[in-house]
Design a protein with these regions (language model features):
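Intrinsically disordered, low-complexity N-terminal segments that are enriched in acidic
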Residues: 1-55
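Acidic low-complexity segments
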Residues: 43-116, 125-131
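A structural signal for short, well-ordered beta-strand segments
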Residues: 46-48, 177, 233
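Hydrophobic alpha-helical segments, chiefly the membrane-spanning helices
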Residues: 242-244
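Short, surface-exposed linear segments at secondary-structure transitions and domain or protein termini
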Residues: 17-19, 68-70, 196-203
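Conserved small/polar residues in nucleotide/adenosyl-binding loops
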Residues: 231-238
Length: 244
């Protein structure tokens, strides 16, 4: 998209081979990694440099072939509960002003739970996080998605990076929400920070929810052993370091 420009990108694996497969209907580049040696661990490293721009939250230049209405469908992670439905009970779109309504529900969701690191897992639903009153960025995103879809607004989960503190030594993955607004297209809201995204965000993938937007998925054949996935990430601001 025009919000960001990839100047370099590479994917490496400690075992097996990597093949670029195709570009899916949402514009994601798909790579296949084949590994017949299942003993021990496998390390996959993806790295690159991305130039970003502040587009006031509007995501421009997406290469997609998917009707936005596909993102009206709720999933097990976004199904609304009574508490979620109550969040916008008294809200109405005045004069069909959808963008103002989106800002309102984003602010409401930002206050609906407290951010508590490690309080939920990747399988935690919007219902569970709002009932316990705490969560992490993915939970804020799921609640906003649930609320937007309940109000007939297509919404989707975004997986990416946020350089929140330019002086921090490490930066990890982040999650936010895109809501489709007529005449504007997809607009990105970060309910965990109660704002639209800016140049500090790097967009990686999108989907119906966390699971659908996952960047790594695997298939096992003729294998009965156990498996686990450990994921680490780091994003750095090159401008701060004098690189751009």
């Amino acid at each position: 998209c025009r919000n960001q420009e990839i100047t370099s990108w590479s994917i490496k694996t400690s075992k097996g081979s990597i093949q670029e497969s195709h570009q899916d209907a949402l514009g994601h580049k798909i790579y296949n990694i084949f590994n017949s040696n299942l003993k021990g661990s496998q390390k996959i490293t993806s790295s690159g440099i991305v130039n970003t721009k502040d587009m006031l939250g509007i995501v421009k230049g997406l290469q997609e072939k998917v009707n936005p209405e596909c993102f009206l469908r709720q999933t097990n992670l976004t199904l609304p509960c009574r508490k979620i439905l109550k969040l916008s009970k008294n809200l109405k779109r005045k004069n069909n002003d959808t963008i103002t309504f989106c800002h309102q529900i984003n602010e409401i969701v930002s206050k609906s739970i407290k951010y508590v690191s490690g309080s939920t897992s990747v399988s935690t639903s919007a219902k569970k996080s709002i009932e316990q009153g705490k969560g992490v960025c993915q939970d804020f995103a799921h609640i906003l998605i649930s609320l937007a879809r309940e109000n007939s607004l297509p919404a989707r989960y975004i997986n990416g990076f946020l350089i929140e503190d330019l002086n921090a030594q490490e930066h990890t993955t982040h999650a936010w929400t895109e809501i489709y607004v007529d005449d504007l297209g997809w607009v990105a809201f970060d309910p965990s920070h109660n704002k639209c995204i800016d140049e500090k965000y790097v967009r990686i993938s999108c989907g119906l929810d966390f699971l659908d937007a996952s960047t790594i998925k695997g298939v096992k054949t003729n294998y009965s052993g156990s498996d686990c996935l450990l994921y680490t990430s780091d994003a750095a601001d090159e401008w701060l370091r004098g690189g751009l």
